[in-house]
C-alpha cells in the first residue's frame, strides 16, 4: 500500500497524425500526390510512479486507431493485384492509392524524468495488440509488366472495372512494438497537455510478406490532454 501512496493515475486522450511508410523513399516511388490522415484518436489510463532523483515510471493501457490514405506515382513498383477475378503480379508503372486503418490496444512502459514541478519527459518501449486491420488500395492509370520489366504489358485504367485492386490486410502483424518519446506539461493541479512520438521498430507486415519490398513502419505523433484522477 505504501508503494502506491505517492503514485498518480491519469485519464488521457489525444489525436494522432502520421502514417505507415519506409524509412527511405525508394526510387520506385516517384511522387506523393496526396496524403490524408484519418481521425486517429487515443483514449486510456496512465499509472505514474515517482522514484528518486526526478526519475519515475509511467505505464497504462490505451485504445487507439491509426490510419491514413495516400496516392502516389510509381515506376517499376512491385505489385500483386486483382482485376476481373484474375491475380496479376509484376512491376507496375502508374498511380497507386492506399488506405490503411488499424485499431489496437497499446501498453507502454516508459521511464520518466521531471524537469521542475510541471514538465515531465518520457521515453521507452511499447507493445500493441491489433484488433482490427486494413491495408487496401488500387493501381490505376498505368500498366503492369507481368513477372519482370520485359513481361507482358497489362493496361490499367481509371474507372473501377479497369483498376487493379489489392488487399494485404491478412498479411499484417497482430502484434506491433516500438519506441515512444514524449513530454507532459501540467498547467493546473489536475490538467495537463501531452505530446509524443511513437515509432514502430518492426514493420506492420509479417516477416514472410514480400509483395511490398520495403519495410513499412508505423510512425505517428500525438497531442492531447491528461486529467489527474489521483
Q: What spans do the regions from the language model cover?
A:
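Hydrophobic, lipid-facing positions within transmembrane beta-strands of outer-membrane proteins
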Residues: 7-9, 39-45, 105-109, 177-181, ...
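Repeated loop/turn-to-beta-strand initiation elements of outer-membrane beta-barrel proteins
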Residues: 54-57, 118-121, 189-195
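Extracellular/periplasm-exposed beta-strand and loop segments of Gram-negative cell-envelope proteins
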Residues: 19-38, 66-102, 130-176, 203-220
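Transmembrane beta-strands of outer-membrane beta-barrel pores
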Residues: 13-19, 63-67, 127-131, 197-203, ...
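Membrane-embedded beta-strand positions of outer-membrane beta-barrel proteins
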Residues: 9-13, 59-61, 109, 123, ...
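Outer-membrane beta-barrel channels and translocator barrels
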Residues: 4, 50-52, 116, 188-190, ...
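Short glycine/proline- and aromatic-enriched beta-strand/turn motifs that initiate or cap beta-hairpins
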Residues: 1-48, 172, 200, 228-230
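Outer-membrane beta-barrel "beta-signal"
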Residues: 185-189, 217-230
Amino acid at each position: 500500500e505504501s508503494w502506491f501512496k505517492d503514485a498518480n493515475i491519469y485519464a488521457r486522450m489525444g489525436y494522432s497524425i502520421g502514417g505507415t511508410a519506409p524509412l527511405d523513399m525508394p526510387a520506385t516511388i516517384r511522387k506523393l500526390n496526396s496524403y490524408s490522415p484519418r481521425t486517429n484518436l487515443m483514449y486510456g489510463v496512465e499509472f505514474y510512479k515517482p522514484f528518486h532523483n526526478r526519475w519515475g515510471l509511467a505505464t497504462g493501457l490505451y485504445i487507439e486507431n491509426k490510419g491514413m490514405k495516400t496516392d502516389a506515382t510509381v515506376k517499376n513498383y512491385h505489385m500483386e493485384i486483382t482485376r476481373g477475378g484474375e491475380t496479376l503480379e509484376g512491376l507496375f508503372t502508374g498511380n497507386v492509392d492506399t488506405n490503411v486503418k488499424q485499431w489496437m490496444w497499446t501498453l507502454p512502459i516508459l521511464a520518466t524524468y521531471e524537469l521542475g514541478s510541471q514538465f515531465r519527459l518520457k521515453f521507452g518501449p511499447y507493445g500493441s495488440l491489433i484488433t482490427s486491420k486494413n491495408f487496401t488500395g488500387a493501381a490505376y492509370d498505368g500498366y503492369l509488366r507481368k513477372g519482370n520489366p520485359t513481361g507482358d504489358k497489362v493496361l490499367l485504367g481509371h474507372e473501377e472495372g479497369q483498376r487493379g485492386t489489392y488487399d494485404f490486410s491478412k498479411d499484417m502483424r497482430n502484434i506491433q512494438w516500438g519506441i515512444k518519446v514524449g513530454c507532459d506539461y501540467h498547467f493546473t493541479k489536475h490538467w495537463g497537455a501531452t505530446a509524443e512520438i511513437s515509432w514502430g521498430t518492426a514493420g506492420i507486415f509479417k516477416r514472410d510478406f514480400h509483395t511490398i519490398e520495403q519495410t513499412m513502419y508505423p510512425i505517428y505523433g500525438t497531442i492531447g490532454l491528461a486529467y489527474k484522477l489521483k
